[in-house]
Amino acid sequence: MPAPVVLILAAGRGECFLASGGNTHKCIGWRQSPEVAPYRWPFEENGRTFDLAIEPQITTNDLRLMLRLALAGGGITIATQETFRPYIESGKLVSLLDDFLPQFPGFYLYFPQRRNIAPKLRALIDYVKEWRQQLA
């Protein structure tokens, strides 16, 4: 199930981003590992998809750290909407440029179709299914 991507900023920190190419604001970047290129932020405009290579003040592979930094006013960051939903709804974070952000295709869970699935895997499968239904 597709999920909206959201660009977020701590409430009260300003909003202009795309016009400047994203490089005049403090940004919090994501990098899966040192061997992988930093994540480029995806955008859509007039049916055209493009992405920006940002110049972050800090780069991390820890989503919780990204969230804490954003909440502390450390910069703009990007993730799926469900990651930041409670903070946007409470007004602690502000969603930016919603009209320019693409849909994230979603996560997939691959597992063997056997009768005797290990109880821990069955619990994970059931949890993920329930979690996705709550988001729908």
UniProtKB/Swiss-Prot annotation:
Transmembrane segment boundaries: none
InterPro entries documented for this protein: LysR_subst-bd
Superkingdom field: Bacteria
General remark: Encodes the substrate-binding domain of a transcriptional regulator.
Sequence similarity: Belongs to the LysR transcriptional regulatory family.
Protein name from the UniProt record: Putative LysR family substrate binding domain-containing protein YagP
Native organism: Escherichia coli (strain K12)
